[in-house]
């Protein structure tokens, strides 16, 4: 979190120069300074959604952490993918486990998807099970407690909340998807989960355009996709919130309106 400083410090020195190797400051908790192109799509989305929270980007987490404390008044540092960042001492380790593929293929990178062996769960203070679909997870919890019998285990699910127009901010209720012919646009790791969410909400998903995770969309490929959707008489294009921040506003209003699906996390155990 970002606390008010008694004596706010300027980032520049007396000669107006920035400190050397300044971290990327997506937000200082009050003002967003970088767009998604320079900060990255996920940091930008965090900065957009988290008022009062500073968001910094840097390979050197120690350097950016010191900057956050000294210049932004932060008293708590939360690292993304921080469990493997052993240069910085941790007071807590929070591990997320996807219920759909809790241990990936069972193998570590590069053969599989695990960054550490399952036994590393023993270091976790909290283990959050994600995308559980409201179903009991006794079997998975039992498997996890073999590695860590003392960590608090939290069961959660990702749930859609509403649709928001990418360029106008107009919001629609989820029922607006029922019976509509929808085209999906995504550049995420597991697009099928997003597409199935739309189907479960009653949409007829007719077109799915998938790009690699974090893909930076070219305007030409987007326009080609928009034209295809118009030719097929789609009612709407739906993308993810993470992808929405990478969509540049076209010069002309698209024939098919473009929305992102707002997803929020709900803890139920």
Report residues per predicted region.
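Phosphate-bearing ligand-interacting subdomains
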Residues: 233-252
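Short hydrophobic/aromatic-enriched beta-strand-loop microsegments
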Residues: 77, 95-97, 153-155, 204-210, ...
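Short beta->alpha linker loops
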Residues: 59-61, 189, 242
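Short, flexible loop motifs at catalytic/binding sites
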Residues: 72-73, 87-89, 191, 201-205, ...
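Short, flexible loop segments at boundaries between secondary-structure elements
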Residues: 159-161, 212-216, 254-269
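C-terminal accessory "lid"/substrate-recognition subdomains
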Residues: 102-236
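Phosphate/Mg2+-binding loops and adjacent switch elements
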Residues: 4-148, 155, 162
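Short active-site-adjacent structural elements
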Residues: 193, 217-218, 245-250, 267-269
